[in-house]
Amino acid sequence: MVEEAQSQPGPLTRAMVEQIDATLLPTLERHHLRLLAHCLASFQEIASPSTQGAFPSREAQEEWCQGHPLLRDDPQFGVLLLRQFEAAGRQLETLAQTLGITPLELTLEQLINAAVEAAKKKHLKQ
């Protein structure tokens, strides 16, 4: 996954994006799912080779941003990305806790399943 993702401009492969789009969730929910998947894949890349445990520390995230070729020349975007990591990290940690796994063990399939279930519950309440 990492090798395929590195040929892309971001951590998500085309197949991952297609898998998200295939959910047919409403546009806003798919966008949110893509953001969470992007952050999860980034955390997993930063933590590599670790595949379980907590997400990387803020310091490790900052180091990764400073060394990433697409972020090196745009420090302001790096600051925004770190804020996004923080917000997404909280949501992903909550999901991992609900599933009884560590945050780094989360998979795209689990994110998709959670998003689809949340959309179903939202639809039933309306």
Task: For each feature predicted by the language model, list its residue ranges.
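Short, basic amphipathic alpha-helical segments that act as recognition/interaction helices
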Residues: 50-73, 103-124
